[in-house]
């Protein structure tokens, strides 16, 4: 069996999780494999030779990207040339479409097979990107079923592999075990999840803490947990907590334990909303962007929803309070009844979980190797 060289690029923590799972599954099927590209600590632990820190790609929002555009373009140009020189058997771009789609196009033109893992939101906005995907991508791997249908209609080779989170999160999470592990007792608990990026926490952190203070007046005995993605986010939140008397426990990571332990979640739009759905926890989704970014997106976005639970259901399962709607009082008012009883909201969550539970990393590995079988 000849050595396989696989190039991968992931742009943020969720991509690092997907990439490491795919790498493990590829190694199980083809032990003589070398990994190069850009990834985080999980991918590096699986053997990735990372050319530069993944964090340099983790930028959110149109306005925020402009501040780093020169660096991003310079890194991308250098990376394309490095990969053309290395001639990997396949390039796999994991999410980060504004960075990776251009790489895929250039590498495919150079005769390298290309895969994109995690569909960009082309069905929601900037739909013309599908033309670039069709030209630059030998195979699209989607995590969600409605995405695969979209690509089939557009003539792009596609495979729905399911979502790795649906594989790893149990169909029924034990709330009491999670509470014991976190040292939490009985009584109502709300998880506050304002995001993992500095910009997100900057825009949503204090808002969520204000909402928590309002909620204390509406739900007697309520307590809060807030998982921090890293030490920098923890320091950011600790600064916001100064002068407040909230019954709140900060956690280092442990977002899954927080979701398992809680009764309801106040959460930023993003992958974490899918995690909350998979844990069958009722949620209120909130998001704020830089005003100019929001103004532009509002005019571009075709989808009526932003959160994954609503996109998967194709209807409003969970409330979304965005931009000016996301006031602390409105968040508390919407969340309070869900803390008391959110069962009506979560009725469809189990069905969605089972649809997404397909052994994603192995499905993705098989699809990649099938693409390479004639190399």
UniProtKB/Swiss-Prot annotation:
Keyword Kinase: no
GO terms of biological process kind: lipid A biosynthetic process
Superkingdom of source: Bacteria
EC number(s) per entry: 2.4.1.182
Keywords recorded for this protein, A-Z: Glycosyltransferase, Lipid A biosynthesis, Lipid biosynthesis, Lipid metabolism, Transferase
Entries under InterPro entries matching the protein: Glyco_trans_19
Keyword Lipid biosynthesis applies: yes
Catalyzed reactions: a lipid X + a UDP-2-N,3-O-bis[(3R)-3-hydroxyacyl]-alpha-D-glucosamine = a lipid A disaccharide + UDP + H(+)
GO molecular function, one term: phospholipid binding
Principal EC category: transferase
Metabolic or biological pathway: Bacterial outer membrane biogenesis; LPS lipid A biosynthesis
N-terminal signal peptide: none
Chain's role: Condensation of UDP-2,3-diacylglucosamine and 2,3-diacylglucosamine-1-phosphate to form lipid A disaccharide, a precursor of lipid A, a phosphorylated glycolipid that anchors the lipopolysaccharide to the outer membrane of the cell.
PANTHER family reported in the protein's UniProt record: LIPID-A-DISACCHARIDE SYNTHASE, LIPID-A-DISACCHARIDE SYNTHASE, MITOCHONDRIAL-RELATED
Protein family: Belongs to the LpxB family.
Name under which the protein is recorded: Lipid-A-disaccharide synthase
Source species: Pseudomonas putida (strain GB-1)
Taxonomic lineage from the root: Bacteria, Pseudomonadati, Pseudomonadota, Gammaproteobacteria, Pseudomonadales
